Structures are given as structure tokens and as C-alpha cells.
């Protein structure tokens, strides 16, 4: 292991001791914002420090085995232990390299999921509903909470547009590479000739903005309109102006929320979504610049990029960014996304390691 890497790991080990001491102080418990930040930092430090401790123990075991070589009776066993120990050290060092990669500060956050029907009309809207169900199932499997923020239903089912909040530790880190165009190939229920149709939806995954510090929204930059909420097909579902439309004048971003009977709650939801969209806008500009510099395949943040195809007749899902094809479409549509998300994260980490080169 390089001395620079060892030095960094030792610093992190000392920092974990400091954080534990700070968390034990009564003043920290009284300040919830500080307590949350320190708890989040501890959760990030602990796996790195544990892996480094394991590495140090393996080094000690290897040194002991080297000493045993001098004893003829122990030589054969020592050689086996040295071989195993070296392999273990190599594996642990690779794991530590990944753990030391620059972390996306948003990875631990909850997220807003926005799905929009694209080309394909009614079939695209139906697929929007399928995608929402897929992500909701995945979230449930991981113990995350899903809350519908805004929906524009289609008359035949599904959604023209739907926004959901997925609340859970690390939700954004697992799903951030889902942003992009998702294409579906299947025979629609309304197709009498049995022909395969192709349609598409756009998915946007946005980290939840920290209300305290991430995004500052000037009230003077907002136009807030209220109107009567309506259901699918345009029928009015209540008698009061509970629906809220917020326009952010400098950017032209518009957010509508009408799912709640309370105008106040609809406004709160709309402001949350607007803050997430503004944060996402900043993120995408930065990601686009970074991706251009390092020719990144995975984390470009380009929403127009076709990232995945769901081919129902063949039962396959293909992610075009990493050339991964899985013949388990039904399981994936039921929320079994772990293999896909894991492969995308691994590819992104490989890109980061390649970009850092000798620095790690």
C-alpha cells in the first residue's frame, strides 16, 4: 500500500474517534442539525475504518507467518498462510481504494422521482405507470417510503407525468443513474394485429434539497397561482382552489401540485419539488462539464440520452451505457433492480479510479 493512502486511512481512523467523542457530548444531542451531520459522517467513516483495521490485522498475520518460515516443522503451513494473506491484502486494498473515492455528498439523501411519458402516446403513459410501480417496489424492498407528490393521469391508465418522493437513507446514491430515456418494446393491449410498438418515457432522479442550506429561493422570484384541482379527464374533484402552481421566473421552471385537499400542503410539496429541480439543474450542469472532461459513460446527467430498453417479447432489459443485457424482465419490473444499479455504480467507480490514476 502506498504511504499516501496509508496516511489518509490513518487520518480517517483518528477522525472517527473524534466524531464519536463529539456525538457523546450533550451539546450535540441538543442541536439536531449538527447531530444529523455528525451521524451521517460517522456512517461514511465506519466502513472505511473497519476495512483498514482488517487490512492491518492481515498485515500482522502475514508478518507472523513470515517468521514461522524459519521453523522447518511450520514451514508448509506458513507458506499456505502467506499465500492466503497476500491474496487477502490485495483484495482489501482494492476495496479500500473504492472506499476512498470522492463521495457524492448527495448519495445519502432522499430523492424526487419524475417520470414523463414521451413518444408513444397512451402506451408511453401506461409504461410511465409501470416504471413508477417498478421503482416503488424496489423502494419498498429496501424499506424506503414512497409519497406521491404530483400526478397527471392518462385517461387509459398510467401517467402523462408523475412525481414521487422516495424517502430513505442512500436512496439517491442507489438510483441516481436511472435518469434518462427508457424505451419499451411490446405489443399494446389495444393492438389487434399483434404488432410490437416502441415508446419511451423520460426519468429524472433528483436529490432532495436541504431546506436550510442547499438552495436559496427568493420569494420575489416566484409567481404562485391557485386553481381548482381536477382528476383524470378534467373533472373537478373539489370546490375550493386547493391546487397550486409555482413558477420560478428566472429559470421558467413550473411546478404544480393538486393531490392534497389542503392548499397549504400542496404549496409545501410544490416548493420541495421546485427546490429539488433547482438543485438538480446545478448538478446536471456540473455533471455535464465533468463528463465531457473525463468522457464518462454513466454519470453524464443527460436526460435525452437513451439509457435502457425493455423488450417484452424477448423478456430482456438492456442498459446501453454499460452494454449489460439481463433476461429477467419480469423480475426487474417487479422491482428487482439490484443487479442493474450495482453494475452502474461499479462502472462509475471504475471510471473514477481510472480518472484518479496514481493518486489512489
From Swiss-Prot:
The keyword Protein biosynthesis applies. GO terms for molecular function: translation release factor activity, codon specific. InterPro entries: PCRF (IPR005139), Pep_chain_release_fac_I (IPR000352), Pep_chain_release_fac_I_sf (IPR045853), Prokaryotic/Mito_RF (IPR050057), RF-1 (IPR004373). It holds the Pfam family RF-1. GO terms for cellular component: cytoplasm. The modification N5-methylglutamine is found at residue 235. Residues 284-303 are annotated as: Disordered. Methylated by PrmC. Methylation increases the termination efficiency of RF1. It is found in: Cytoplasm. Keywords: Cytoplasm, Methylation, Protein biosynthesis. Peptide chain release factor 1 directs the termination of translation in response to the peptide chain termination codons UAG and UAA. HAMAP family: Rel_fac_1. Belongs to the prokaryotic/mitochondrial release factor family. NCBIfam families: prfA (TIGR00019), PRK00591.1 (NF001859). This is Peptide chain release factor 1. The lineage of its organism: Bacteria, Pseudomonadati, Pseudomonadota, Betaproteobacteria, Burkholderiales. The gene is prfA.
Amino acid at each position: 500500500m502506498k504511504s499516501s493512502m496509508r496516511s489518509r486511512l490513518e487520518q480517517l481512523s483518528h477522525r472517527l474517534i473524534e466524531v464519536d467523542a463529539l456525538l457523546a457530548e450533550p451539546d450535540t444531542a441538543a442541536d439536531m442539525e449538527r447531530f444529523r451531520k455528525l451521524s451521517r459522517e460517522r456512517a461514511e467513516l465506519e466502513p472505511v475504518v473497519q476495512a483498514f483495521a482488517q487490512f492491518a490485522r492481515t498485515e500482522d498475520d502475514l508478518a507472523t507467518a513470515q517468521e514461522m518460515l524459519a521453523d522447518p516443522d511450520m514451514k508448509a503451513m506458513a507458506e499456505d498462510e502467506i499465500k492466503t494473506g497476500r491474496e487477502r491484502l490485495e483484495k482489501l486494498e482494492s476495496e479500500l481504494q473504492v472506499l476512498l473515492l470522492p463521495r457524492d455528498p448527495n448519495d445519502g439523501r432522499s430523492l424526487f422521482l419524475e417520470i414523463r411519458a414521451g413518444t408513444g402516446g397512451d402506451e408511453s403513459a401506461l409504461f410511465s405507470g409501470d416504471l413508477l410501480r417498478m421503482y416503488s417496489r424496489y423502494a419498498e424492498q429496501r424499506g424506503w417510503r414512497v409519497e406521491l407528490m404530483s400526478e397527471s393521469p392518462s385517461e387509459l391508465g398510467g401517467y402523462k407525468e408523475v412525481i414521487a418522493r422516495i424517502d430513505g437513507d442512500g436512496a439517491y446514491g442507489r438510483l441516481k443513474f436511472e435518469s434518462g430515456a427508457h424505451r419499451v418494446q411490446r405489443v399494446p393491449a389495444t393492438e389487434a394485429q399483434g404488432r410490437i410498438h416502441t415508446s419511451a418515457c423520460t426519468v429524472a432522479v433528483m436529490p432532495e434539497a436541504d431546506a436550510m442550506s442547499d438552495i436559496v429561493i427568493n420569494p420575489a422570484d416566484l409567481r404562485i397561482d391557485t386553481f381548482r384541482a381536477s382528476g383524470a379527464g378534467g373533472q373537478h374533484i373539489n370546490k375550493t382552489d386547493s391546487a397550486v402552481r409555482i413558477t420560478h421566473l428566472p429559470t421558467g421552471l413550473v411546478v404544480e401540485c393538486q393531490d392534497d385537499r389542503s392548499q397549504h400542503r400542496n404549496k409545501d410539496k410544490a416548493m420541495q419539488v421546485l427546490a429539488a429541480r433547482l438543485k438538480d439543474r446545478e448538478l446536471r450542469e456540473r455533471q455535464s462539464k465533468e463528463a465531457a472532461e473525463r468522457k464518462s459513460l454513466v454519470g453524464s446527467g443527460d436526460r435525452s440520452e437513451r439509457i435502457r430498453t425493455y423488450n417484452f417479447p424477448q423478456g430482456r432489459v438492456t442498459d446501453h451505457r454499460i452494454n449489460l443485457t439481463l433476461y429477467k424482465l419480469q423480475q426487474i419490473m417487479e422491482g428487482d433492480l439490484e443487479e442493474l444499479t450495482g453494475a452502474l455504480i461499479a462502472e462509475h467507480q471504475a471510471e473514477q479510479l481510472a480518472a484518479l490514476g496514481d493518486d489512489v
